[in-house]
């Protein structure tokens, strides 16, 4: 098989929109020997995420032979990692980022990818921002609960847009709700259901979707699977489920009949059906369904870091980055282990510490 026919096959087996197909065709015509170093400006190529997905989804049956398969994989990998413009460290970060997102629960994968992080640190910041939104102790309980509902609705809506079965969507929503309760118990209560000052924790309202006693199998944010209803911060009988009969969901989606208590939530939901992404980036053309996501994305282009530390002047693109940094100056360690009392300034460090406790428990079981 000639080199020209191989190149034509490379084009045919990659289903792309017209513009992307034209770009790939021009590239191959200008570089017929398959050598590295295309004359096409890299900033004119499609989103690297497109090529990453094609690289991972490529099958042997998609090529006429092993040599062609390797050639096509090499080309897709190069279009994804872009060694002509990226340093070795940046390429390493891209691979680490891909694996990090892959090990997240499905609902968090969607959330992170929708924010388009360019490295592992940005992905962590996205999750920490979500965590602070779900469980900010400085806000009234009613506001935290409402934020939690909106974020859950947002994540579930994104999963609906990708066609997840309703049973999986229910599991996603339950996991998100339970995760916020788990985080609350980790930070504010000990194993006997007491708060940090020794008083009994007030009765908590169990999220309505979580009537069963078993915790969902996959917990968000890396929380160890050591909690069950009736243990640790929430002893049996401590939950009270309350209903507000006067609360009605008056906003109905004409497409699917789903009800919403807020008109703004209905508007966001309807974008699932319409595919509307009204917030477009003028720099690269990417579009987003929410203005807040666009604002975060634009900082990639502008380098804007609006959150500045008053102590040392260091600036951050995300508020959560500033909050974490300020603990260096204050010495604050708000994340406390409920088993041994050790405190940490970062939630990720607490989760790693908790896993060590779990490992010790497993070793004790094995020894017995």
From Swiss-Prot:
What is the reported tissue distribution? Answer: Expressed in many tissues except in heart.
Localisation per UniProt entry: Nucleus
Residue ranges for the region (Necessary and sufficient for nuclear localization) are: 251-301
InterPro entries tied to this protein:
SCAN_dom, SCAN_sf, Znf_C2H2_sf, Znf_C2H2_type
Domain of life the protein comes from: Eukaryota
User: Family assignment?
Assistant: Belongs to the krueppel C2H2-type zinc-finger protein family.
Q: State the protein's name.
A: Zinc finger protein 24
